[in-house]
Design a protein with these regions (language model features):
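Short internal loop-to-helix segment that lines adenine-nucleotide cofactor pockets
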Residues: 70-92, 140-142, 154-156, 169-223, ...
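Core alpha/beta nucleotide-donor-binding catalytic domains of modification enzymes
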Residues: 122-125, 129-165
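Alpha-helical elements of the RecA-like P-loop NTPase motor core of helicases
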Residues: 103, 125-126, 166, 210-214
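S-adenosyl-L-methionine
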Residues: 2-131, 136-140, 174, 191-194, ...
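Conserved beta-strand termini and adjacent loop/short-helix elements that scaffold enzyme active sites
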Residues: 144-146, 185, 230, 260-262
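Short, glycine/acidic-enriched loop or turn micro-motifs at the edges of active sites
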Residues: 96-98, 122, 148-150, 205-207, ...
Length: 279
C-alpha cells in the first residue's frame, strides 16, 4: 500500500465548494463511478488557484495540480530514489504517469541532470506536462509519448486516465472502450539511438514488466546503474505471463530483486518498487 509522506498545503483557504466536495467524498464508502469521478475533477478545475504544495521529508516542495491531489509518495521508494539520483544524473522514468517522481528526479538531478519520462496515455501526459511546467523543471525533463516494451511498433493501450492503472493490453485481450493504439519502443533501441547511458531507471508499467526487461538487456547490463521496478503480480495472469518467466529473465540478465524494506516479499508486493541488483 502506498503511504503518503508529503504534507498537502494550500496556497489559499479552501473554498466552500472544495469543503463540500471533501465532505461528500468522506461520506462515500464505495469507489465513485467513473462519471462521478470525472464530475469531481471538473469541479476541482473551477476552484480558485491551480495547484497545491506538498512538502516532503527532505524539504522538497512539489507543486501538485488540484485535480491530482491524490498523488502520494511511498517512504521507502522516496528514500531509495533520493539516494540513487545524484546531481547530474540521467534518469529514465518508465511509466511516469502524471509525474509524481519525475518532478523529484528533476529536482535531485539538478540543472546539470536529465530526466526522460515515458508515458503513452494522452490524458495522463497532459497531467505530466502540467506538473513539469508548474514545478519549473521543463529545462531538464523530456517527455516521450510512447509505451516502453520489448521493441518498436504499436500496441493496444487501455487508458484509465491518471488513476495509475493505465496498461498495455495483452495480445489476446480484445479491444474495448478506452483502448487506443500507442507507439512502443524499447529501452535498448531508445538508448542506442540517443547514445544514452542512464544513471537510474525506474520502471512502473502495470504488468508489462517482462516486455520492458526483455527490451532492455543491453541497457541494464551497464555498470553502475541503479534499477528499480514495480512488480504487479495480481495482473500477470491476465497478461499471460508468470512469475517464473520474470524470474528467468532476471536470471538471464544476472539480476536479482531486493525489497526496499526487509519485511516485504518481492514476489507478493504491489505499490512499491524493488531494487534490481547484479548477481
Amino acid at each position: 500500500m502506498t503511504m503518503q509522506v508529503g504534507r498537502g498545503e494550500h496556497f489559499r483557504e479552501g473554498s466552500w465548494l472544495e469543503r463540500r466536495i471533501a465532505r461528500l467524498r468522506g461520506a462515500r464508502t464505495r469507489p465513485a463511478p467513473a462519471a462521478l469521478r470525472r464530475l469531481h475533477e471538473l469541479m476541482l478545475d473551477l476552484l480558485p488557484g491551480d495547484h497545491l504544495v506538498s512538502t516532503l521529508p527532505g524539504g522538497e516542495r512539489v507543486r501538485v495540480a488540484a485535480r491530482h491531489r491524490h498523488l502520494s509518495w511511498n517512504p521507502e521508494e522516496y528514500a531509495a530514489f533520493k539516494s540513487a539520483v545524484r546531481p547530474g544524473a540521467t534518469v529514465l522514468d518508465v511509466g511516469a504517469n502524471v509525474g509524481a517522481y519525475t518532478v523529484l528526479f528533476a529536482q535531485w538531478a539538478g540543472a546539470a541532470g536529465r530526466v526522460i519520462a515515458f508515458e503513452p496515455s494522452p490524458e495522463t501526459i497532459a497531467g505530466l506536462r502540467e506538473h513539469v511546467r508548474i514545478n519549473a523543471v521543463a529545462d531538464r525533463v523530456e517527455i516521450v509519448d510512447a509505451a516502453v516494451s520489448s521493441g518498436e511498433g504499436t500496441a493496444s493501450f487501455d487508458c484509465a486516465g491518471a488513476s495509475g492503472a493505465n496498461a498495455l493490453v495483452a495480445a489476446d485481450g480484445g479491444i474495448a472502450d478506452g483502448v487506443i493504439t500507442v507507439r512502443t519502443t524499447s529501452l535498448d533501441r531508445f538508448c542506442e539511438s540517443r547514445g544514452l547511458r542512464p544513471s537510474v531507471i525506474k520502471i512502473d508499467v502495470e504488468g508489462a514488466e517482462l516486455d520492458v526487461l526483455r527490451g532492455a538487456r543491453q541497457t541494464l547490463a551497464q555498470p553502475g546503474l541503479d534499477i528499480f521496478v514495480e512488480f504487479h503480480p495480481s495482473i500477470w495472469a491476465a497478461r499471460g505471463i508468470t512469475r517464473d518467466e520474470i524470474a528467468s529473465e532476471l536470471e538471464r540478465q544476472g539480476l536479482h530483486p531486493q525489497p526496499l524494506h526487509p519485511s516485504l516479499d518481492v514476489w507478493n508486493t504491489e505499490g512499491i518498487s524493488v531494487r534490481l541488483l547484479k548477481n
